[in-house]
C-alpha cells in the first residue's frame, strides 16, 4: 500500500467492482477500449483477474470518500521474448474517473507510483505512451519531468473506423530515468 496526502494506492479487492465499472463503462481514450465493462458482473470478473496482481497494479482510492477513482499500473519489460525475468524498465498506465480530472489526483498518484518504482523496485527507466490527442496525459507526463522522446505516426490501432478499417493513432513516447527523477526533487 502506498499513501499520499489525499490518496491510497492499494491492490484491488472484490468490493471495488462497482467503482471500477463507473470509469470503465466509457473509457475516455481508445487505448482503454478493450477494457470496457458493461455490467457489474463483468466488473466483478475483472476484479477476480486483478486479485493476484499486487506488485505493479493498484487501485487509486480517494481517502476522504474511500472511493476507487482510478488505477495505475506498471508493465516491466522482459529482457527478451524468451526470458520471463523483468528488466529495470517499466511502462506505466494510469486511468482516472472523469469526475476526478483536473484535481491533481493523477499527478499525486503518479508521483507516489514513480517513487515506489524507482526506490522500492529498483527501476532505472520509466517510459509512457500517449495518443497525440490526449493532451491531459501529455501535460501529466511533462509535469512529472518526463521528456518527450518521439512521435510514432499511425503507430497502433485500438478501434476501427466506421467503415471497419483500423483507426491508426499517432502515439507520443515520454520517459524519465531514475537519476532524472531524483534530480528534480
Spell out what each predicted region is.
Residues 51-53:
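Soluble sensory domains of the PAS superfamily and closely related sensory modules
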Residues 1-31, 57, 61-185:
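Acyl-donor (CoA/ACP) binding surface of acyl/acetyltransferases
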Residues 28-49:
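Conserved GNAT-fold acetyl-CoA-binding loop/helix
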